[in-house]
Swiss-Prot record:
Protein name: Carboxypeptidase E
Keyword DNA repair carried by entry: no
Residues linked to a glycan: N139, N390
Subunit structure: Interacts with secretogranin III/SCG3.
Entry keyword annotation includes Repeat: no
């Protein structure tokens, strides 16, 4: 079972069926219109994709529809509940759903963190349906992705905020209504501020990764964290995610770490140790979006400052400083590299534009997903072939390490080049290997570590052999 508070698929679907909507019957919740009131239901439909806004009951229905169509490669689970009790639903697509396969990287998309930024929510619903459709058609790219990657899609991290924003009359929505969760908390300012810690560690020495290691209990006890924030923190800690994107709205740009500036100034390029690969990852998204990558595109609003934008990408701190954001939290608390993608100048654009947004972003969403198969991957084992979990894999010249998962598997995103990788673990002798990294696929580098106890036994045997040889030579 993936994710804290997750429920088994059959239990979830059983509950949904009991509510009478699994196969299309009406579902209702307080303050929401009945799903049967279809609002020009199926306004624009193409290959099973309904280009319309999905309220909470309709979102659940859409995900279950994908699962019913592609049961062999999909699973629905929840990582927790919002403040008002709505489930934070995830649909997983994999050739072995529900299972972490050793050596297979884990990917996630998260949408609708700000409830009134609605395009990402809909694009992820569309993406789930598209992946299912194309898999069944035998699309080689999609089949290979699903067979080699465990894909997790959370359309809405802030379902309460979305319902508030969507409940406003008319198509023109307020710029701020629904942005925060039901407690009034901005979720993208609510994560533990690990940037401050790593900036101190850069100067004084200290860890450069996994800065919340073994601190789940402290997270649970922190009353300043929203339930949505806590749920995602546990999700990040429970699954060995490698790559992620957080979909927002209000501009057109792919934003990469660090989001918070080192000096505390409002605008300052704040590079992470992995600045090169983050720039490449951001371009992998923006380059396939014609509007985002257009160098002649005017700013979304007259007085907007997009001077930091290059090829549809920007460093977060150079644009504006964001403390407590989810993007940097992923990078500094886990092995997961995340960017933030702003999808639209309008936060809640008219429904009839959703199909155009899908067409503009479909190839970008797939291109970004493919980036997970870059860099280096492999296993860390002992001399008997047993996996070594939590081994550290460091790259010479890059002050950010990753660690191996429970099966000893690891993934390290890198741009093409020649590198020295070192694997180390407590009680073992470290090993360094050289590797030439292509653009893709990821180069395979395995490590077999010798324990100190094995080395002592080996040295003892060597000493005994030497003593025996000397005794025979000197006849004593």
């Amino acid at each position: 079972m993936a994710g804290r508070g997750g429920s088994a698929l059959l239990a979830l679907c059983g509950a949904l069926a009991a509510c009478g909507w699994l196969l299309g019957a009406e579902a209702q919740e307080p303050g929401a219109p009945a799903a049967g009131m279809r609002r020009r239901r199926r306004l624009q439909q193409e290959d099973g994709i309904s280009f319309e806004y999905h309220r909470y009951p309709e979102l659940r229905e859409a995900l279950v529809s994908v699962w019913l169509q592609c049961t062999a490669i999909s699973r629905i689970y929840t990582v927790g509940r919002s403040f008002e009790g709505r489930e934070l639903l995830v649909i997983e697509l994999s050739d072995n759903p529900g299972v972490h396969e050793p050596g297979e990287p884990e990917f996630k998309y998260i949408g609708n963190m700000h409830g009134n930024e609605a395009v990402g929510r809909e694009l992820l619903i569309f993406l789930a349906q598209y992946l299912c459709n194309e898999y069944q058609k035998g699309n080689e790219t999609i089949v290979n992705l699903i067979h080699s990657t465990r894909i997790h899609i959370m359309p809405s991290l802030n379902p309460d905020g979305f319902e508030k924003a969507a409940s406003q009359p008319g198509e023109l929505k307020d710029w701020f209504v629904g942005r925060s969760n039901a407690q009034g908390i901005d979720l993208n300012r609510n994560f533990p501020d690990l940037d401050r810690i790593v900036y101190v560690n850069e100067k004084e020495g200290g860890p450069n990764n996994h800065l919340l290691k073994n601190m789940k209990k402290i997270v649970d006890q922190n009353t300043k964290l929203a339930p949505e924030t806590k749920a995602v923190i546990h999700w990040i800690m429970d699954i060995p995610f490698v790559l992620s994107a957080n979909l927002h709205g209000g501009d057109l740009v792919a934003n990469y770490p660090y989001d918070e500036t080192r000096s505390g100034s409002a605008h300052e390029y704040s590079s992470s140790p992995d600045d090169a690969i983050f720039q490449s990852l951001a371009r992998a998204y923006s380059s396939f979006n014609p509007a985002m990558s257009d160098p002649n595109r005017p700013p979304c609003r007259k007085n907007d400052d997009d001077s930091s934008f290059v090829d549809g990408t920007t460093n977060g701190g150079a644009w504006y400083s964001v403390p407590g954001g989810m993007q940097d939290f992923n990078y500094l608390s886990s092995n997961c590299f995340e960017i933030t993608v702003e999808l639209s100048c309008e936060k809640f654009p008219p429904e009839e534009t959703l199909k155009t947004y899908w067409e503009d972003n479909k190839n970008s969403l797939i291109s970004y997903l493919e980036q997970i198969h870059r860099g280096v991957k492999g296993f860390v084992r002992d001399l008997q072939g047993n996996p070594i979990a939590n081994a550290t894999i460091s790259v010479e010249g890059i002050d950010h390490d990753v660690t191996s998962a429970k099966d000893g598997d690891y993934w390290r995103l890198l741009i093409p080049g020649n590198y020295k990788l070192t694997a180390s673990a407590p009680g073992y002798l470290a090993i360094t290997k050289k590797v030439a990294v292509p653009y893709s696929p990821a180069a395979g580098v395995d490590f077999e570590l010798e324990s100190f106890s094995e080395r002592k036994e080996e040295e003892k045997e060597e000493l005994m052999e030497w003593w025996k040889m000397m005794s025979e030579t000197l006849n004593f």
